[in-house]
Amino acid sequence: MPELLAHYPFTDTAYHELLDRQGGVRPHWQRLFRQLERSSPEQLRQRQALVERQIQENGVTYNVYADPKGTDRPWALDLLPNLLSAAEWQPIAAGVAQRARLLNALLADLYGDQRLLAEGLLPSELVFGHPNFLWPALGIRPPGGIFLHSYAVDLARDADGRWQVLADRTQAPSGAGYALENRQIVSRALPELYRDLRVQHLAGYFRTLQETLASQAAGDGETPLVVLLTPGRFNETYFEHLYLARQLGFPLVEGHDLTVRDATLYLKTLGGLKRVHAVLRRLDDDFCDPLELRTDSALGIPGLLEAVRQGRVLVANALGSGVLESPGLLGFLPQACRRLLGEELALPSLDTRWCGEPQALEAILAALPDLVIKPAFPGQRCEPLFGHALDSAGLASLGERLRERPQAYVAQRLAQLSQAPVWRDGEAGVGLQSRAIGMRVFAVAASDGRYWVMPGGLTRVASAADAEVVSMQRGGASKDTWVLAERAVGGEPLRPRRLGVRDLVREDPYLPSRVVENLFWCGRYAERCDDHARLLRVVLSRYVDADGDEEALRSALALAGGIGLLPGDGEPLERRLLRALLDEHWPASLCANLRRLHWAAAQVRGRLSGENWLALLELQRDMQALDPARTDLGEALDFLNRLVMSLAALSGFALDDMTRDDGWRFLMIGRRIERVRFFAESIAAFLDGGSAWDAGALEWLLELGNSGITYRSRYLASPQLVPVLDLLLLHEQNPHSLRFQLQALERSLERLHEEFGAPRERELRTLGERLRSFDLAALESPLFGAAGLDEVLVGLARLLRDIAACAGQVSDRLGLRYFAHVDDVSQRTVST
């Protein structure tokens, strides 16, 4: 690849990670640079494609709040890692470890004796005015005195190559999981380079976190249960929560999965309440307990703070640690370090001054064009303001705001970010380009209180060459961060503890009720989408067929309208059919049900295989690609054909890929309940519709029941009522028959009775027995002629409607007993 640096922008106003001041390649970058020179654009293009394919296959995503379509956006990762030599890394690691010790000691002081406040080393307005200073947490001392179990710091390198701290992340630091995922992807894309450069491993960080939480948890002699608390799937880093939970072996839970009883935290599982000993939270401080903190929080656990206060549960990081994330504190840390640790602060902060100091305010106002103004506290609706970007009127207005509320703002010198090479292949050309970067470094507390720094981190890349801010929310990308060792590094994967026969686990002991509930509804919505797609396909195929059977179309439309699948009669039929498919505001539309399926599946993404999740995403994309205003019936019919095949693949994933545990059982129960309800209602409506003896109508009924091929192969005749009803209602070997589904549902419910002591569903069993005892011969020789025949069909339709209603009642009782944990007596109270 000749002239690799011919178009690489090189300036002396910023530090270049790749190049020294003379434009030469730095020593620790030379091995990577030589490989780039030997590689053709096509080879690098293939490696970048491998990175992107791995991201897609692994489902690595990041939610961008500002983008309405930003949910589950693919993670952006550059092919080229950011390299740091061992000599460069050592002072960084030492400085980060010292800073973690300092901030831990600072939290102990703020929620303890408050010596720094009493001595005037910290302004009380910065502490007590911070919304994340939690007065209810005052006096709480966590086990071992560890407030910060994990810590992250955002670093940038100035033009002279010196590292400076931009921000401290103390309450729920994110990014470590993404750093590990980046490592696994890039090391596969550049395997020879990764081996030859002797890159230090990241696994020690995660192993230390596991060990610390387990050792510090309030166990009372029990094996500690540690959970990872997430705000849910709409959090920007939800993928990381899933990924960390899998890597660490912690159940991923949301606030309503947990409950506090007698100052003890419990996980609500299918088998009852299980005590939780430690919580690794990804939830901000004030959302954690609506009882004592933010009362409008729907994400936290009422009573959690009291459980912490009583020493019954460990929360990492300690509640209230978010107070240290105020940028206003940065300027006071050097003197705090001397007072608390007796040391000089090794890693300096970016020059930052709090506007609440009168002397500082005057100096800030005089230098506004050269500064960046930021809010002093989180929650203020104010983006950073760059003084150099404001005109004289804007500067005057900003000055007035600072004078009115000086304590609400801080001023920082504009950070001069270092530049790193990125691989670009686009309209601007192929080759190396330069982008501003920042680096987030992570530290974890060991059980003895010392901090271990991850040798690497998350390098974030600006979205454009002229970007002044590095932010994933603003479209930025990431890099893997390689810290090079001076000698060969031994293999160090994430080594789990050695497991023996005594450790074997056949069932998930910590399956949250919420997970089971969402799997149950995954099953119901998947089956509902399949049923509705098949019925719409029946109607559309006969509607677009100019030479079709009018009676078959009439009966199919009557059925679709009778069970509520079609909107009202006030519109043309073609419009009603398209609305039934594509109108997301019509509750019974296929589009609305696919959206519900995606929602339920997203809640249990960690329980689904990668292939299963990708198939669900593909379903959603296919539906979104259809424009309701432009789609015609032919396109709609083609989509329905593809949709039925995709839903069949989803069903296959459930049958072949999932472990037959309680979660799978409830998924299948959900499918069977939905199938029984739909098919019983549909055949009842068909029998009442007056077309029971019409061959064309019976043909589409077989198609709806996915049994047309079976019928033709057995009877070699046009459809007739008696054999059709036998195949669809009574055939015990046809997996699509009502009898087969009822028996499978009864077996699953009996299993719940045996495992959990649930009351038997006697009414459903009785109705199933009545169906199985139905004599089809009554349709051949009725006692009272045609009137008797009609009475038989009416009675059968009534029985089918009773079965459908009973299946719905079974669903309600399952929800009360297993998802809401309402006991049997309370269920009877609710039902009356």
Question: Where do the model's predicted regions map?
Answer:
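ATP-binding N-terminal substructure of ATP-dependent carboxylate-amine bond-forming enzymes
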Residues: 2-27, 149-151, 157-164, 168-314, ...
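Fold-independent oxyanion-binding glycine-rich loops
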Residues: 153, 168-169, 231-232, 282-283, ...
